[in-house]
Amino acid sequence: MKKLFALVATLMLSVSAYAAQFKEGEHYQVLKTPASSSPVVNEFFSFYCPHCNTFEPIIAQLKQQLPEGAKFQKNHVSFMGGNMGQAMSKAYATMIALEVEDKMVPVMFNRIHTLRKPPKDEQELRQIFLDEGIDAAKFDAAYNGFAVDSMVRRFDKQFQDSGLTGVPAVVVNNRYLVQGQSVKSLDEYFDLVNYLLTLK
């Protein structure tokens, strides 16, 4: 029992230390959206965004730093990419639907930012999946399905409701926008996100 009290006391001190360290308006911004009912970190991104591409390794590390019970969600926005913006959001939703996100996200970023060969149309977009061994029939069913369309609408609605204007953006508990430019190290960035997860 003493150990339990010691652990709780340590956690409370940690949160207090973070509260003193991180300030609203400097390290994070409070959005006008209602807080989520459970802890969640939302990243808004676009495959067409060069900063999002650079941010990917940090996001990969952030996922490993989140406490048990905290959910991570990636949301593709459609406002970048011209006439392919919506199609690329559908492509990302298709990755989720087919459970090939871990495989295909690096492929798509590499295609656009390293090879500099972004798909010109939906046929080329489809071929990228097929070239990576994704079954054509499964791709077509998912890409043209209701679940993917619903996901894309949710991505864009969440982005619009948040009042955000650019990507990458990380929002904690649907309410706290991380202002990463104010932190001095990756560890401090992870501490900031984990602190915001304690807020309602």
Curated annotation (Swiss-Prot):
It holds the Pfam family DSBA. One of its GO terms (molecular function) is protein-disulfide reductase activity. Coiled coil: none annotated. The keyword Signal applies. Its main location: periplasm. Residues 20-198 form the Thioredoxin domain. Residues 1-19 form the signal peptide. PROSITE patterns: THIOREDOXIN_2 (PS51352). One of its GO terms (cellular component) is outer membrane-bounded periplasmic space. It is found in: Periplasm. Keywords: Disulfide bond, Periplasm, Redox-active center, Signal, Virulence. One of its GO terms (biological process) is cellular response to antibiotic. Disulfide bonds join C49-C52. InterPro entries: DSBA-like_thioredoxin_dom (IPR001853), DsbA/DsbL (IPR023205), Thiol_disulfide_DsbA (IPR050824), Thioredoxin-like_sf (IPR036249), Thioredoxin_domain (IPR013766). PANTHER family: THIOL:DISULFIDE INTERCHANGE PROTEIN DSBA. Belongs to the thioredoxin family. DsbA subfamily. Involved in disulfide-bond formation. Required for the functional maturation of secreted virulence factors. Acts by transferring its disulfide bond to other proteins. This is Thiol:disulfide interchange protein DsbA. It comes from Vibrio cholerae serotype O1 (strain ATCC 39315 / El Tor Inaba N16961). The gene is dsbA.
